[in-house]
Design a protein with these regions (language model features):
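Surface-exposed amphipathic alpha-helical segments
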Residues: 161-201
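Short conserved aromatic/hydrophobic patches within beta-strands of well-structured domains
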Residues: 48-63, 187-195
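C-terminal motif of bacterial Sec signal peptides marking the signal peptidase cleavage site
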Residues: 13-16
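Conserved polar/disulfide-associated segments of primarily extracytoplasmic proteins
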Residues: 24, 31-34, 45, 62-159, ...
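Sec-dependent signal peptide recognition
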Residues: 2-8
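Bacterial signal peptide processing site
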Residues: 18-21
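Short aromatic-glycine motifs in intrinsically disordered, low-complexity regions
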Residues: 37-49, 176
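Active-site-flanking beta-strand signature of metal-NTP-handling nucleotidyl enzymes
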Residues: 9, 159-160
């Protein structure tokens, strides 16, 4: 009898202790972001200039994902601290139909991410330097939440996409996305064309 009472008391105590248990939300590591400061990308052999963060590094790239560069003006801006990079491709409108370039930009933003993105929001813009384009904000568990293209519609067409080398998770990437999104928009707003670029080395 005493054994049964002890057993019942133990079960009651165990149940009471666990009845108030609630699942705690998953936590993520706190990120210490650097202070915002910018430097100018102003290589005379490139047909564009812009400002980018001092915590980023510009690397010349011969590929834009699996697409071979058609000219030497394709670059990446790497952010080693955040395992992210901005892929930048440049195309000359004269050698490509403007409508085709715009359609390709929409295809890259929509068709390749629709199955993972919960929403895609295109935002037309005009920069302080009177250049126009569209900024794509992608919601959901995608490897990219920020894509854009910018053009003068007659000669220059530049496309950019911020990607992370990490398992796509909207909640964990949101702080870094928000931080670097400001840098992407700063790049866009400071971008200018250089009509006479010298031959690249």
């Amino acid at each position: 009898m005493k054994i049964r009472i002890i057993a019942v008391s133990f079960l009651f105590f165990f149940y009471s202790c666990n009845s108030d248990y609630t699942i705690k939300p998953r936590g993520y590591f706190k990120i210490n972001f650097p202070q915002k400061a910018y430097q100018k990308f102003d290589n005379p052999s490139y047909p564009y200039t812009f400002e980018y963060p001092v915590y980023g590094e510009v690397i010349k790239d011969s590929l834009f994902f699996d697409q071979k560069a058609e000219n030497p003006y394709w670059i990446n801006i790497n952010f080693p601290e955040f395992n992210g990079k901005i892929y930048i491709s440049y195309k000359e409108v004269g050698k490509n139909k403007f409508d085709s370039l715009v359609n390709d930009a929409f295809t890259m933003s929509y068709k390749q991410h629709t199955y993972k993105a919960s929403a895609i929001e295109p935002e037309p813009f005009i920069t302080p330097n009177n250049l126009s384009g569209i900024y794509f904000t992608l919601k959901g568990n995608t490897a990219t939440a920020n894509q854009f293209f910018i053009t003068d519609s007659t000669k220059h067409f530049l496309r950019g996409a911020l990607y992370f080398d990490a398992v796509p998770n909207e909640d964990s990437l949101q702080p870094v996305n928000s931080f670097l999104q400001k840098d992407v928009r700063h790049l866009i707003n400071t971008l200018q064309w250089r009509n006479k670029a010298t031959s690249p080395l």
